[in-house]
Amino acid sequence: MKDEQLYYFEKSPVFKAMMHFSLPMMIGTLLSVIYGILNIYFIGFLEDSHMISAISLTLPVFAILMGLGNLFGVGAGTYISRLLGAKDYSKSKFVSSFSIYGGIALGLIVILVTLPFSDQIAAILGARGETLALTSNYLKVMFLSAPFVILFFILEQFARAIGAPMISMIGMLASVGLNIILDPILIFGFDLNVVGAALGTAISNVAAALFFIIYFMKNSDVVSVNIKLAKPNKEMLSEIFKIGIPAFLMSILMGFTGLVLNLFLAHYGNFAIASYGISFRLVQFPELIIMGLCEGVVPLIAYNFMANKGRMKDVIKAVIMSIGVIFVVCMIAVFTIGHHMVGLFTTDQAIVEMATFILKVTMASLLLNGIGFLFTGMLQATGQGRGATIMAILQGAIIIPVLFIMNALFGLTGVIWSLLIAESLCALAAMLIVYLLRDRLTVDTSELIEG
């Protein structure tokens, strides 16, 4: 490993190390918002609602591909960080090689089992009429690019795992930048419409994956792309998948709960959907910053879980304090200028009032949401597979019964408050799991929870 990477893992001031690992991840998570709207933005110029619907309907498929990337990326990435903390550099080469080629194989399987059934999958996603063929065509490109999409997510995680978060950010920036260039060329220049949008995203993922591969081949002595080293054993598979499977489940369940919430809101009409949509876009930015903060320090926690548990404790304290500061600043902003913030999106006073109310409730859950993110990341980093699995399931399962109960008792207001209640229960569950696992973590987590 490079001396600079070891410095941030082992010796730099805790806050400096936290920002070194987290800042690129924060920027990356914010870029993901841009990434998600690029295709719709360019397709919007064609003024064809069927094309916009086709792209929107494919989002669950992208979430699944991202989840498959996390299966190897998060699972192997946290394991690699722990191996580096234990100075077991040779084993990390075997882990990385197996995960890279395992991810590619998984992508090829996706092509085989989905490509022949793209029309049927489009129909399952809700495509009808003119939208069906457009959605199917978009899906075909997505399925064909699956190996590279999965590989991109794996390699991006590996860059952070070895202490090179800036490389991770550069890869994401390159992918988004190339997509911005390619989309208008393919959509308008070659008149490919939704297929052009899909190709722009696919080519961007291929380019980013190749960037990471070239970087690791030239600069890393702990991540290997040598297929001869892709030899798994029982211990390796256990360490990868006990964390990778919960990460995969979390990606899938988060998308599912979002779908369920939309169904509840749809019951109250466009007024409710529009109000929530505005508040969601406003709360999304601080939420993504906190998510980037918590995910960014996962390699730092994993490394010091093996190398220096006192430093690991200091990192967790620093993250909790940072989450608290972000929460206080956001709450002050919402309760002082929240009405004006919502007014930037609409002049409809009824929607402004409802969206402002929703914004206050959802922003109030930011602290608890952050604690949940941090402790889930901590369980992943330290290899606590059972705890991570329980948290992944709870984050998807808790909100559904809460939504049904609150909707039955209080209607739309209950649906809105269910978000805060569910986040509170998830945060309490995370604290309880970490407390119960305190002996395995060998760090005084009870002090963190009480303090």
UniProtKB/Swiss-Prot annotation:
Q: What induces the gene encoding this protein? A: Repressed by MepR.
Q: Does the keyword Nucleotide-binding apply?
A: no
Q: Which CDD domains match?
A: MATE_MepA_like
Q: Which GO terms describe its cellular component?
A: plasma membrane
UniProt membrane topology term: Multi-pass membrane protein
Similarity section: Belongs to the multi antimicrobial extrusion (MATE) (TC 2.A.66.1) family. MepA subfamily.
* Gene Ontology terms describing biological process: response to antibiotic
Q: Which UniProt keywords apply?
A: Antibiotic resistance, Cell membrane, Membrane, Transmembrane, Transmembrane helix, Transport
Q: Which residues cross the membrane?
A: 26-46, 54-74, 97-117, 139-159, 170-190, 194-214, 245-265, 282-302, 318-338, 355-375, 397-417, 418-438
Q: Name one GO molecular function term.
A: antiporter activity
Protein name as it appears in the record: Multidrug export protein MepA
Q: For this UniProt entry, what is the primary localization, expressed as one broad class?
A: membrane
Location in the cell reads: Cell membrane
Quote the gene name from the UniProt entry: mepA
Per the UniProt record, the source organism is: Staphylococcus aureus (strain N315)
What top-level branch of life does the organism fall under?
Answer: Bacteria
One Pfam family assigned to this protein is MatE
Q: What is this protein's function?
A: Multidrug resistance efflux protein. Contributes to resistance to the glycylcycline antibiotic tigecycline.
InterPro entries assigned: MATE_fam, MATE_MepA-like, MATE_MepA_subfamily, MdtK-like
Which PANTHER family does the protein's record reference?
A: MULTIDRUG EXPORT PROTEIN MEPA, SPORULATION PROTEIN YKVU
